[in-house]
Amino acid sequence: MRSVRLLPAALGLVTALVLTATACGPTETPAADKPAAGASSSASATDAGTGDGGAGLSKDLADRLKKRGVDLEKWKDGEWKDWDRDTWLREAEDFVNPVIDGLWDPARMQSAKSPDPTITAQAAGGGTDPTPRPVRAQREKTPYHRNAAPVGKIFFDSPQGHMVCSGTIVKDPRRPGRSNLVWTAGHCVHAGKKGGWYRNITFVPAFNDLGKSPSALNNAQPHEVYPYGQYWADWAVTSGEWINRGGTDQAWPYDYAVLHVKPQRGSKSLEETVGAALPVDFSAPAPARAGTIGAWGYPQAAPYNGVIMHRCLDRATRMTTAPATPVMYRIGCTMTAGSSGGGWFRVLPNGKTALVSNTSIGPAGSNGWLAGPQLGRGAKAAHDMVSKKYAG
């Protein structure tokens, strides 16, 4: 009975996501003609989103770096590897992410590991429904740019090494049709209570577009690994709750983040280039009213390999991680770490598909379910903060 009710909604979600891809394929792309969430400054090493080109820093960007004690040349030469707690920038306004040309080559991307946000217990009481049955993750159809264009991988560096998450291109209401916004999890950009902002954050839409195996990807051409290029983040916002308490059970319901990425030199916006972006649903419907939710991402922890996009579809249930904290969505899903930050989508009453959450946590020691935050006023404030900064 459960699967019979799920099927129509599941098919609708998959179909709706496919229909978000309207641009040319990556080889056909024509030439380009601040709340509950904390604000953050950032800067690029060049005027180009990937660092390509010879333009230098603007005075404004250079001043921002100087105020935060960042010497650009020393940073590019390896100073970014210094994770000393006393100098690790962590406050809302401290985010800096200078581009380092050529840093994220295919080999470095392959070596990136996934963070492992898990939880061993839930709060007792009426805020958690029975554990959902596992839903086996399905491989997304290839090429990804035709079937799930808004979905991609986020690469970054942490004290533990090269890391990877998932992310989704979302619409910018102040730049209709020209968004440069990417939605992900807070723990994919900031270490939370015990640390600061991660570094060298870049987004790769439709990573491994043809779904090649890890061994085949080792010999792939760059355009097969990142068909639309790389988009370095030049601004980031996460929730104040995550910055102050991230990594504790009290913070998981606030585990979301918004990135602004800068297009490559002379190119159109991220949305125009990829041809896809999803609206965000900030109505925070109760799990029982959210209906079928689809989660997309690139799971990396065993039994997955991190290079293949997967999806799960299930009806949302309730989960709480600590007393007096907001309820989270939970679905049955066998995706593992690496899918963190990947978008959760639902079909709205008007028939449109919208992002309603992102992958935050899973169970310690197994891979049967995922949980994500409800996106309400705090999440909307974070989204608005980035949108307003880049309006025009």
Predicted feature residues:
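N-terminal carbohydrate-binding/catalytic regions of secreted carbohydrate-active enzymes
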Residues: 92-206, 214
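Secretory targeting and sorting signals
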Residues: 1-28
